[in-house]
Swiss-Prot record:
Residues 81-176 form the Toprim domain. Signal peptide: none annotated. This is Recombination protein RecR. One of its GO terms (molecular function) is zinc ion binding. May play a role in DNA repair. It seems to be involved in an RecBC-independent recombinational process of DNA repair. It may act with RecF and RecO. Disulfide bonds: none annotated. Keywords: DNA damage, DNA recombination, DNA repair, Metal-binding, Zinc, Zinc-finger. InterPro entries: DNA_Rcmb_RecR, Rcmb_RecR, Rcmb_RecR_Znf, TOPRIM_dom, TOPRIM_RecR. Transmembrane segments: none annotated. A zinc finger (C4-type) spans 57-72. It comes from the Bacteria. PANTHER family: RECOMBINATION PROTEIN RECR. HAMAP family: RecR.
Length: 201
C-alpha cells in the first residue's frame, strides 16, 4: 500500500527513538495527525530548539543550554569537594532525585570498551584528569553502571585518582529494597555479601 511520502518520512524519523519499531512509529504518527496536531507542532518546536540550543556543560559535560550547568554554577556545590562520575546525564537526574548528594558531577557519556574502540579520550578522561589536577577535590564517587565495562571504567578512574592522592569510592551495589533474595542474580548477591555493613546498636 502506497502512503504519503511525508507520512513515511515522519514514521521513519520516529523510529530513531529507543524502543520504537515500525508499528509503534506508525501509531505515533497516526495519533499526532488524527488527534493531536497541536501537540505535534509543540513537539516539533521543542525538538528543533533542543537540538540547536542544548550543548554540554564546560565542566561536567551534562546537557545544558548555558556554558555551565546550574549544578556546576552553584557555589555551595563547588565548596563540597566531591565529584560523582556517571555514564550519562540521565544518571545525574536519578541521583539528584535521591537528595543524598550535594557535590558536582562528571559525565563520561559512555564507558571504556576496547573491543568497540572506545578509549579514555573518547569518554573525556583527559578532561576529568585536568579537573582533578586543578580543583580542590577531596573525593571522587564512581557511579558507573555495575557491568564489566562499568567496573573497568571505575577501576581506571580510581588509578588516576591515586596519582593525585584523591580518595575514590564506588557506590554500593546490592539487593534492591523490597526485593526477594531468591529472585536476585548471583553477581548482585555477591556484591551484597561483599559490601555488607555491621549493625550498630
Amino acid at each position: 500500500m502506497q502512503t504519503s511520502p511525508l507520512l513515511e518520512s515522519l514514521m521513519e524519523a520516529l523510529r530513531c527513538l529507543p524502543g520504537v519499531g515500525p508499528k509503534s512509529a506508525q501509531r505515533m504518527a497516526f495519533h499526532l495527525l488524527q488527534r493531536d496536531r497541536s501537540g505535534g507542532m509543540r513537539l516539533a518546536q521543542a525538538l528543533t530548539r533542543a537540538m540547536s540550543e542544548i550543548g554540554h556543560c564546560c565542566d561536567c559535560r551534562t546537557f545544558t543550554e548555558e556554558e555551565r550547568c546550574t549544578i556546576c554554577a552553584n557555589a555551595r556545590r563547588q565548596q563540597n569537594g566531591q565529584i560523582c562520575v556517571v555514564e550519562s546525564p540521565a544518571d545525574i537526574h536519578a541521583i539528584e532525585q535521591t537528595g543524598q548528594f550535594a557535590g558536582r558531577y562528571f559525565v563520561l557519556m559512555g564507558h571504556l570498551s576496547p573491543l568497540d574502540g572506545i578509549g579514555p579520550m573518547d569518554i573525556g578522561l583527559d578532561r576529568l584528569e585536568e579537573r582533578l589536577s586543578q580543583e580542590p577535590i577531596s573525593e571522587v564517587i564512581l557511579a558507573t553502571n555495575p557491568t564489566v565495562e562499568g567496573e573497568a571504567t571505575a577501576n581506571y578512574i580510581a588509578e588516576i585518582c591515586a596519582q593525585y592522592d584523591i580518595a575514590a569510592s564506588r557506590i554500593a551495589h546490592g539487593v534492591p529494597v523490597g526485593g526477594e533474595l531468591e529472585m536476585v542474580d548471583g553477581t548482585t548477591l555477591s556484591h551484597s555479601i561483599a559490601g555488607r555493613q555491621k549493625i550498630h546498636y
